[in-house]
Design a protein with these regions (language model features):
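PP2C/PPM-type serine/threonine phosphatase catalytic domain
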Residues: 1-196
Length: 196
């Protein structure tokens, strides 16, 4: 498998609070992660870095992730450890109040491919010449679209399109939305909401 990542602050922001990693464990299973930090005093960078550092180092030390069920449990257990660490950091560093991060990840083994997300960073697969979105954004506008209260074509220009309904560092317990995907794909793409 070929893998790479690109990160760029873009034209709007002076600095980038995204963190990204691609790691292999001891049996060659792959974990890909993008985390988009938020919060003042560069706290977003701290939060997003906590995600990729914690998950990446623990995954790299595994001999195997095991079954799909084992993988989901491992991911949620580690996501909640990270979430607790972010909340603790905020408590100990009041200047970082409001700190948090989104996370989107893909886990590829010889037997399965799963995606997981919290927030509005997205996961896609490229298959048969088309890009397919896998994850669902945790935003107010997306909830309104799913509830039938807002037309999809109105979502892009809605004044509250950037209101996140879920992120690490905002609640005491978090659960990844997990998506089981056919592993026979041409490419996997993860991105923060800033990709245009």
């Amino acid at each position: 498998m070929k893998s790479f990542y690109i990160t760029d602050a873009g034209r709007v922001r002076s600095h980038n609070e995204d963190s990204v990693t691609i790691v292999k464990n001891q049996t060659g299973e792959h974990l890909m992660i993008v985390a988009d930090g938020m919060g003042g005093h560069r706290a977003g960078e701290v939060a997003s870095s906590m995600v990729v550092t914690h998950l990446g180092s623990r995954f790299a030390n595994l001999s195997t992730i095991g079954t799909k069920f084992d993988a989901v449990n491992w991911l949620n257990e580690n996501i909640n450890t990270i979430n607790t660490n972010i909340l603790k950091y905020t408590e100990e560093n009041p200047e970082s109040t409001g700190m948090g991060t989104t996370v989107v990840l893909a886990l590829l083994t010889k037997d399965f491919l799963i995606f997981g997300n919290i927030g509005d960073s997205s996961g896609f697969v490229f298959k048969n010449g088309k890009l397919h979105k896998i994850t669902k954004d945790h935003t107010l506008v997306n909830l309104l679209v799913e509830a039938g209260e807002l037309a999809p074509e109105e979502a892009a220009n809605h004044p509250k399109k950037n209101v996140r309904m879920k992120a690490l560092g905002t609640e005491t317990k978090q659960v990844l939305d997990v998506f089981d995907v056919d592993k026979n794909v041409d490419a996997i793409m993860l991105c923060s909401d800033g990709l245009t």
